Amino acid sequence: MTLNGLSNPLSRIRSLLTRRQLVQRAALGAGALAVGTLRLPRAAQAANEINFWASGTLDIGDDGWKIFANESGVKVDFTDNGNDPGPVVARLAAGNANDIYDVGGLDGGTEKELAKRGLIAPWDLGQIPNYSSVWEWAKDIPHSTFEGRVYGIPTVVNADSMIALRNRVGTVDSYGVIFDRKLRGKTAMEDAWINSVIFTAIYLKNSENAKISEPGDLTADELGLVMEFLIKHKKDRQFRTFWNGWEQGLQLVANQEVWVMTGWEPIVYAARRRGLDCYYAVPKEGYEAWIYNTILLKGAVDRGLSMKAHQLANAFLSGFYGCKLGMLRGYAVPTDNNVAYATAHARAFDPAAVKELSEHVKAKFAGKVYWQNARPANFQLYEQWWQRLRNA
């Protein structure tokens, strides 16, 4: 199965801002990390307003938030957190983030660390009735709970694999093509351990019988095995490059400098709009699954905003937010309330397109997936190894 036969559920996308693109912007200056320091103290904000500090991918724009507020009774003041888990955790632990923001949105994996340090609070599911509509497998994501309590409300889910040009490589179904010597110089991976390490680990575990237990959370020995494999292939000039950011990733495919690479699904749709026969591969080894969770910051509880924060989390699952986010980003909020909302508001959203996006994501998760972890136990070792690869 490929996406070639699937009609484009993103035909009305107004923005292809990706979940990692904000990291690029942060690299241009300190603005993404310093933005909170210029804000008013939380006590000066409107009583019915929630400061939502999350990846830019979760933003639905001023018009979207206006409708959201009218329907939910919660006014959202959105601030981009830069998307990189490291600085976000640092600002919560040692900075002023908990003094300013109420609710966060972040790649799954940091919840355990934040909960253990008392920086976030557990959700009371009794105050989030729409939680019952969340797809069951999304509720079971291990990152979302700690000591039996839910700290992350699943807000966006997807699963990544490979972008391929059919006229160059035909139909591919294994990550092995990324490391195939016949394609030396025509493959690529992302310059980010959070994605490239797990892709490689998934391949080695399933196709090379490597002794790897959990590709998303490698032991020191497992990580060494994976990184030595990548470094060897880099030295052998297997990869055209380790790409960085949306624009470079898209250009590599659009210019056909790279024929197959691991990457983000929206690149496929953007490349198709440029006339390329491009598809998203279905790897026999399994997908890299990821999630954005909504987290309740401890500062909001201390300020008496817990009830309003729960109202926000419930509204994320009510249908409008999922429809709007799907239209803007092509990512799915894991609830069938999206389809019900689109059906009731067919002038604003195409019910068929909303359903198609949901079914497309569900189909991925019906197969083999391995969860990305934004904060594996050895994350500092990951950083060290990745720098070694860059220098190789």
Residue ranges, per PLM feature:
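N-terminal export leaders
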Residues: T18-V35
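Mature extracytoplasmic/periplasmic domains
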Residues: L296-A366
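Early extracytoplasmic/lumenal segment of secretory-pathway proteins
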Residues: A47-E113
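Extracytoplasmic ligand-binding site segments that recognize negatively charged/polar headgroups
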Residues: L58-D62, G105-E111, A115-Q248
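Periplasmic-binding protein-like
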Residues: L223-H233, R274-K298
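N-terminal secretory signal peptides
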Residues: M1-Q21
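A bilobed periplasmic-binding-protein/Venus flytrap-type ligand-binding module shared by bacterial periplasmic
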Residues: S161-R168, I202-Y203, I291-L305, K324-M327
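Conserved C-terminal helix/tail region of periplasmic/extracytoplasmic solute-binding proteins
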Residues: E359-A392
